[in-house]
Structure formats: structure tokens, C-alpha cells
Amino acid sequence: VEEERLSAIPSRCFRLIDQTGTTGCLALALLNDEGIIAGCEGDLQSVFTMLAVKVLTGKNSFMANPSMINARTNEIILAHCTIGIAQTEQFIIRNHFETEIGIGIQGILPTGDVTIVKCGNESLDEYYLSTGTLVENTNYINMCRTQVRIKMNSPADYFLKTPLGNHHIMLYGNYEDILEEFLQANACKRIE
């Protein structure tokens, strides 16, 4: 990272598992805690989003899968097997959900206001941006280890109808205005 002067790196997680027999979840968590943006599954759009969030807000973020979407209650559950330890109130070392090997991290996160953002499209010229409230840490057996239920301030059916990919980025606090200003200044189109 230092030699190449990198600010962010994606990891091809499932290839890593195939090659080494273990996961990179803990390594990615520790890199993020050290201020090196590290994302999963080779998702360059989400890694770019995480980098933009860090530069604009100074905050670390959580890359996650929308794993449960309830349009009726306007809630989603975001889940993933890695999160920077510094973002958690406490954490539990578990195995990786999909493979049941290696290390996955179940982070217990504080409740409160959050921002959800994703830069997308091949040219990174579209984005999703919303705020919500993290209301609960869940512990379902059928999804990745860190799980948070979020009551959205915009329609949750976006995740069912027009999502900009799978991973979305969550950060603590309401940063909608600063992110909106940056994305609009760069001629990006907001997707609702």
C-alpha cells in the first residue's frame, strides 16, 4: 500500500478463499481501521464510494449487502462479514457466513442516524443517497455476520426496483447535504 501510494484497495474475496482456504474479512477490517479503504468482492464502485465518503466527511464507512428489504415498513437490513472494529461498540469473531470458514466479524453497532450512499454506473455518474436510523443489530443465521436494521427516510423499494448494484455504503450521522453537493457538482444523476 505504501510502496504503491494507494488510498484504497478492493479485494477479490472469493478468489482469495479459493486460493488460501481462508477469508480476508479480518484483514479488510484492520486495513479500514488504519485508514486504508478496503472493500470486498472487487467492487470498485463501492470502494470509490467509501473513499469519497472518507475524503468528504472524515468518517469510516460500512460496505454491506441489502439482505432484507421491507417496503411496507420502509426498513432494510444491511449485512456483511467485515466491518472496521473501530466502528463497533463491541464485536464477536465468527466464521464467514457463505463458506463457514475463516474469520467473519459480527460488529455490534450503535443506534442512531446514518447515511446510505452508493456511486454507480460504469462512469460513476449515478448515485443513490438517503438517510435513516439504525434501530437494531440483528442476529439472523441466514445472512452475513454484522447485521443492522435501518428505518429508511426514503422508500426502501429502491433496493428492490432500481439498485445501483448490491453493496451499499453506510456511515454514522446525516451527511446527505455534503455528499449531495459533491455528487451534483460532478454532474452525477441521483437515482431514487
Regions found by a protein language model. Give the residues of each.
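Flexible, glycine/charged-enriched surface loops at secondary-structure junctions
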Residues: E2-A8, N60-P66, E192
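C-terminal catalytic subdomain
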Residues: G35-N142
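Long, internal scaffold/assembly segments composed of regular secondary structure
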Residues: V1-V47
